[in-house]
Regions:
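Iron-sulfur cluster-binding electron-transfer modules in prokaryotic oxidoreductases
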Residues: 1-252
């Protein structure tokens, strides 16, 4: 996200700032990458990387671990920090859980007049198959997106993007990813008629962007917090409508 999806991180920061938690968070310099390759091939590496993450949290004296829009990193931390750290484990949250909590408590406001496009949502396998993160993003989207439409099937039964398990990083498998799983996913996306496809996972975003380009689908792939960044009201800042007007001028 630092290199490929900066708007996602900007959306994260905007939520923290608007919620009044601007001075309560940080990003660890010694363990800023949430990828845990041990999840693919080695329990020993899985445990070692988890302990490196926990060591960094302890160095920073953090009370909670907040994972951004990455299905892999979220699952690795959420499922295996308690496994390996036991009673010493810090609570782990996906950023969408934090954002929804802020929304419910009235700590942030999202302008429902900003997003006029039809929006749909893709469920990343790593956070949806277990039923952990399914309803939260939909509740957030419905709070400020007038034209939200779900995929079919959805939630735990949603189709994989086709790039999971490391496949998205293998260029030699591009044709396979596009013509097998990608074809099914493209047809599913097309049926929604969506102009914006929300995918809160870097792996999924890369695969879905390639699918959209390959099948020439008329939609844009982005993260949930990319979209939130458009509509969030920033205390003391310009309104979402003013920011939208400015963005339109730059796009001309």
């Amino acid at each position: 996200d630092y290199l490929m999806e900066p708007d996602t991180l900007m959306g994260n920061a905007a939520v923290l700032y608007a919620a009044g938690d601007w001075d309560k968070w940080t990003i660890g310099l010694c363990n800023y990458d949430g990828i845990n390759y041990g999840l693919f091939y080695s329990d020993w590496h899985l445990e070692n990387i988890i302990k490196q993450l926990v060591t960094e949290v302890e160095r920073l004296q953090g009370r909670n671990i907040l994972i951004g829009e990455c299905g892999h990193a979220s699952r690795a931390a959420h499922d295996f920090i308690p496994t390996f750290m036991g009673k010493e484990a810090r609570p782990v949250y996906n950023f969408m859980e934090y954002t929804l909590d802020c929304l419910r408590r009235g700590k942030i406001k999202l302008d429902p007049t900003i997003v006029t496009e039809r929006v749909t949502y893709h469920d990343p396998c790593n956070i949806a198959r277990s039923g952990w993160i399914v309803d939260q993003p939909r509740e957030i989207l419905r709070s400020f997106v007038p034209d939200f439409v779900d995929m079919a099937p959805k939630g735990e039964d949603n189709y994989c993007c086709g790039g999971g398990g490391g496949l998205v990083s293998i260029d030699e498998l591009h044709d396979y990813r596009m013509e097998i799983a990608g074809k099914v996913k493209a047809e599913q996306i097309e049926r929604t008629g969506a102009e914006l496809l929300i995918a809160p996972c870097a792996n999924c975003k890369k695969q879905l962007k390639e699918i959209v380009e390959h099948y020439e689908l008329p939609c844009t792939v982005m993260g949930l917090h990319d979209l939130i960044l458009r509509a969030i009201e920033i205390p003391g800042g310009r309104s979402p409508a003013e920011r939208k007007e400015e963005a339109a001028l730059f796009a001309m």
